Amino acid sequence: MTTFRSILKLVWPLALGMVNNAVMQFVDRTFLAHSSLAALEAVLPAGILMWIFAGFFQSVVGYSSVFVGQLHGAGDEAGCRTCYRAAKWIAVVSGVLMLPLVPVGEWMLAWSTTSAETLAMEKTYYDITLLGSFFIYGQMAAASYFTGRGRTRIVFWVNLLGNALNIALDPLFIFGIDWNLPLSAFTVSLRLPAMGIAGAAYATVIAMAVQWAVLAVVAHRSMARDGEAATSSGCGDKGDATFLSRERTLDILFRILRFGVPSGLYTILNMLSFTVFVFVTGGVGELELAVSNACFTINYLLIAPMEGFALGASTLVAQAIGRGDREDAARAARRTVLLGVGVALGLSVVVLAFAPLVLGLFASQAGASSAEFHALGWTLLVLMTAWQVFDAADIILSGALKGAGDTKFVMVWLLVVAFAFWLPVVFAVRHFHNTMPALWATMIGYVLVLFVGSVVRWRRGTWRGIEVASGT
């Protein structure tokens, strides 16, 4: 039976890993801000566009964790290894498919950017990170192999290693080095030219490559060890006779695509809808935009752990279904939602308690009136707390639905609510009452409707009849 303690044991490395990624992005942008204003302006649109493309393939590859989870729950460790091989093939193909997206992205950036200097930097960052996204997919395939089996600490420590390397390389690559190290008989000169935004991109790609390499080595050693143990025992794992079966690998590969593609589309639609909202809020006013951006930064740091809870819910539900215990799957989802909402509410209360201090970090950088900045900031933080609870609950419950294979509903429901309900309301508010609090208030209705729909879907139990991995 899934207990709160077992949930926390699985989830905390995932949640901290997501926070770790958020901090890394913040540090990246801080270094670029000291490089040039154009670099800071370029990294956000280029990064968003890259992740709109790469996020789809990352989500598809990452869905292999659900298959690993279900097969692990069923005791089919050979099937888990086959899932990893299938995920690696998807990762390779995904990396190749990035090539034609380079000119597509460059055209989109040229269409939306007026400054030649900023456009050149956007293209540089976009090209390097998009072509280097192969390592992201490889890393995700290996990470999913461990996450689905509940070994989340390995993923966390490797993630921490990669992000620490990224932060260490950032200043060296962005600003360059010119060191003369005197030794006993001669002097060693170390020189690296300043690469600006290209350096930040290279640092990110190198860090991802290191994460992929470490996880891949550990995964292959684990697979070899498990395979040898199964062979020497004389009985093996369930499905061990098909360990090298191409037919089973292809079957799992196409099943991952069947359920993973809607999950990838969900990621794209989520990013697109939120990007449109951010662009709409940019037309309210300079002070309002500065405050909104500051609060969005805070919100990102708070919501990042919920992505870890969602992945944990997906894994726990998948493992329970693999064991044939769908009641425990429901219990795991319910308890993970409760824990996640509690954490989200607690973090929001802490932010509100220290709101003057938190907002003060951004007010000085914005060069705005402190009183006006703090007044509007407080209002937006209160609204953020209101939607944070429902947003956290929906993110985690959507993760549970994905773990049960109900990815089409999650994708279609987001499409309908975001583009047929929320964004039309946002544009109407912009036309009739163009204030930042009014625009932010629409987020509460948006995430509330999303959550209610997810709850109804979960309680109807459609997910109980979905078969994800064959043989479970």
Show the residue positions of the predicted features:
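N-terminal transmembrane alpha-helices
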Residues: T2-T30, H34-S35, I48-F67, A91-L99, ...
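Transmembrane helical elements of multi-pass membrane transporters/channels
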Residues: K9-D28, I128, Q139, G162, ...
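Helix-terminus/linker motif at the lipid-water interface of multi-pass membrane proteins
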Residues: V19, V23-E41, W107-A116, I174-D178, ...
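Hydrophobic transmembrane alpha-helices of multi-pass small-molecule transporters
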Residues: I52-G55, N166-D170, W212-A216, L301-A304, ...
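Short runs within selected transmembrane alpha-helices of multi-pass transporters and secretion channels
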Residues: Q58-V61, S65, T129-T147, V155-N163, ...
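Small-residue hotspots at the loop-to-helix junctions and early N-terminal turns
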Residues: L37-I48, E122, Y126, E286-L301, ...
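Small-residue-rich hydrophobic transmembrane alpha-helices
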Residues: L40-L99, P103, I136-G150, I154-V155, ...
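Short alpha-helical transmembrane segments in multi-pass integral membrane proteins
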Residues: M1-L14, V68-F134, D178-V261, V317-A386, ...
